[in-house]
UniProtKB/Swiss-Prot annotation:
Residues bound to ATP: 20-23, 61, 65, 175, 178
Enzyme Commission number, as recorded: 2.7.4.22
Organism for this UniProt entry: Paenarthrobacter aurescens (strain TC1)
Cross-referenced SUPFAM superfamilies: Carbamate kinase-like
Protein name: Uridylate kinase
Residues involved in UMP binding: 60, 80, 141-148
Biological role stated in the UniProt entry: Catalyzes the reversible phosphorylation of UMP to UDP.
Length: 245
């Protein structure tokens, strides 16, 4: 008689988050990588990884922005691939500082580059997180025309993250208008994706927001400024703006 394997996947017992860091954050607002900024971010992540499973998507805007390069006459696909390579450089920088902080880290790239990163395999990423490792996803989606916001939403869904954490520079959440231009702008503590889309509030790009909305994935938009904000966001403390399906 044939034996049927009825083993089921164990349910995750810890909170699992997907942290989205822009290239501008990694660069400290300048071109390239700002070591002190990345070191500070790594220490904040390290303070939370014993309690929470963490995956990270990193942008590449501190090196290249495909959309901007294409406006200057470069082929959009080629420009986007340059941006993807920029994200991998940021991943390696963050990996280095995380490991200096005592956190075992893996980089997974959507573009094969076996000497510096693993291939992107969702099941393997989940296993790494279950073992207490941080996983950093690089090279975007491995395809042109996809923003790293969209990649953050997609990766979060594929590794079964509980929430997407959007780290922002210069703003501490979502406002009714640009607070730098409109002094009457009010900060929103809670916002639905429907409201954000209807009012054209640019939390992240529309493709990413729609993906989160359709799959009931919540998001927290918070400011990088403030002592320990990255740690607090990872641990699930209330800060910034909660965007809900």
């Amino acid at each position: 008689m044939e034996t049927v394997n009825t083993a089921i996947q164990p349910e995750k017992t810890r909170r699992r988050v997907l942290l989205k860091l822009s290239g501008e954050v990694i660069g400290g607002g300048k071109l390239g990588v700002d070591p002190e900024t990345v070191r500070a971010i790594a220490k904040q992540i390290a303070a939370a990884v014993t309690e929470v499973e963490v995956a990270i998507v990193v942008g590449g805007g501190n090196f290249f922005r495909g959309a901007e390069l294409s406006q200057s006459g470069m082929d959009r696909s080629r420009a986007d691939y340059m941006g993807m390579l920029g994200t991998v450089m940021n991943c390696l920088a963050l990996q280095d500082f995380l490991e200096q902080a005592g956190v075992e880290t893996r980089v997974q790239s959507a573009i094969t580059m076996g000497q510096v990163a693993e291939a992107y395999i969702p099941r393997r990423a989940i296993r790494h997180m279950e073992k207490g490792r941080v996983v950093i996803f690089g090279a975007g989606a491995g395809l042109p025309y996809f923003s790293t916001d969209t990649v953050a939403a997609q990766r979060a869904l594929e590794v079964h993250a509980d929430v997407v954490l959007m780290a922002k520079s210069g703003v501490d959440g979502v406002y009714t208008a640009d607070p730098k231009k409109d002094p009457t702008a009010e900060k929103l503590d809670v916002l639905s994706y429907d409201d954000a889309l209807r009012r054209d509030i640019r939390v992240m790009d529309q493709t990413a927001m729609t993906m989160c909305k359709d799959n009931s994935l919540s998001m927290v938009v918070f400011g990088m400024e403030g002592e320990g904000n990255v740690t607090r966001a990872i641990l699930g403390e209330t800060l910034g703006t909660l965007v809900t399906p």
